[in-house]
């Protein structure tokens, strides 16, 4: 009898890229739904435009490279990138912002480096930074939460603002009663004007609590989605735990040392894109460290950078910059923190 000798692995597990992407997209849907509830249909429209742009851009690049189109589009990595860009952009921002950002993410950051698995930076965060430095006013003017808006904007109103030139011009100037700064931006501005954190938190945008109106529930929804990813073993805990833990510890020290000039740990954890970053952005396996201890350090680095940028930097939310800086350090982390050889105990 002839025996066939095959190389390892001898036991295989079905973990196709498309299945992983589907689970991540599914886990992000509660956060998307809560964002739409508080900030209107604009978020949903931005996501739809981003997805259509991502698929078209990737198909065009693949055709130019003489690569098969259908298998690459079916892995849904472009859809996930587009989803992350769509939820990160202000809901009523002009349509060309999401188109520019998505094309840059897919063409320049992903395909120019060789496609899926070859990119050095997180495509969604690279696109966000490009838009932030190119259109700072548009990217920092968010729709007012539905609980604070003077009037409720329907889907047709959102389409009119996003796609019409007049609506885009009005949005750039700030539509009275419809658009406003984010809680992070409001707190940062108030602190620079000499107000205490406690005085700033009394503004209507904070909803009378310790977090921004609506943003607590958005972050809680992304946290629930992240727990689903952990439960299904789609992601491992190291990066998320390192990020949340480091941000909590830094916030605790800052708040304990000077509560008048520093936000509380609860505010930092449930404001901005903290939970989205912890479970859906920083955990990108392509641009993160690979070893367990390396991933823990990678996540902690992002958490510390988020806190430093939010507290001392020029931007209210430092998630995108923190992730990109950590992406740069990922190869260095892998070089110095190597996984234990198989058979050793004590690895994380």
Swiss-Prot record:
Cell location: Cell inner membrane
Record bears the keyword Magnesium: no
EC numbers, comma separated: 7.-.-.-
Cysteine pairs bridged by disulfides in the record: none
Coiled-coil residues: none
GO cellular-component term (any): plasma membrane
Keywords: Cell inner membrane, Cell membrane, Electron transport, Flavoprotein, FMN, Membrane, Phosphoprotein, Translocase, Transmembrane, Transmembrane helix, Transport
Membrane topology: Multi-pass membrane protein
Protein name: Ion-translocating oxidoreductase complex subunit D
Native organism: Shewanella amazonensis (strain ATCC BAA-1098 / SB2B)
């Amino acid at each position: 009898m002839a025996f066939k000798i095959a190389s390892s692995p001898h036991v295989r597990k079905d973990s196709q890229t498309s299945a992983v992407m589907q689970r991540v997209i599914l886990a992000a849907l509660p956060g998307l739904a809560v964002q739409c509830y508080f900030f209107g249909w604009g978020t949903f429209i931005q996501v739809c435009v981003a997805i259509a742009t991502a698929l078209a851009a990737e198909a065009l690049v693949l055709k130019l490279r003489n690569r098969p189109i259908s298998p690459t589009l079916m892995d849904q990595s472009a859809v996930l990138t587009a989803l992350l860009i769509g939820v990160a952009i202000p809901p009523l921002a002009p349509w060309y912002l999401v188109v520019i950002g998505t094309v840059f993410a897919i063409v320049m950051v992903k395909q120019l480096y060789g496609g899926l698995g070859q990119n050095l930076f997180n495509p969604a965060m690279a696109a966000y930074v490009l838009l932030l430095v190119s259109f700072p006013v548009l990217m920092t003017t968010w729709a007012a939460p539905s609980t604070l808006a003077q009037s409720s904007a329907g889907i047709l109103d959102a389409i009119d603002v996003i796609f019409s030139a007049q609506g885009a011009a009005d949005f750039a100037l700030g539509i009275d009663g419809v658009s406003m700064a984010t809680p992070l931006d409001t707190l940062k501005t108030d602190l620079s004007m000499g107000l205490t954190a406690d005085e700033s938190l009394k503004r209507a945008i904070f909803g009378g609590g310790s977090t921004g109106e609506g943003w607590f529930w958005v972050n809680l929804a992304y946290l629930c989605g992240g727990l689903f990813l952990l439960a299904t073993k789609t992601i491992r805990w190291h990066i998320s735990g390192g990020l949340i833990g480091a941000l909590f510890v830094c916030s605790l020290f800052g708040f304990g040392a000077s509560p008048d000039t520093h936000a509380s740990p609860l505010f930092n954890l449930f404001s901005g894109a903290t939970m989205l970053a912890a479970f859906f952005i920083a955990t990108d396996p392509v641009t993160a460290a690979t070893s367990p201890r390396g991933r823990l350090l990678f996540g902690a680095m992002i958490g510390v950078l988020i806190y430093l940028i939010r507290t001392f930097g020029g931007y209210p939310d430092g998630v995108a910059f923190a992730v990109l800086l950590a992406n740069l350090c990922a190869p260095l982390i892998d070089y110095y923190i190597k996984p234990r050889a198989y058979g050793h105990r004590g690895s994380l």
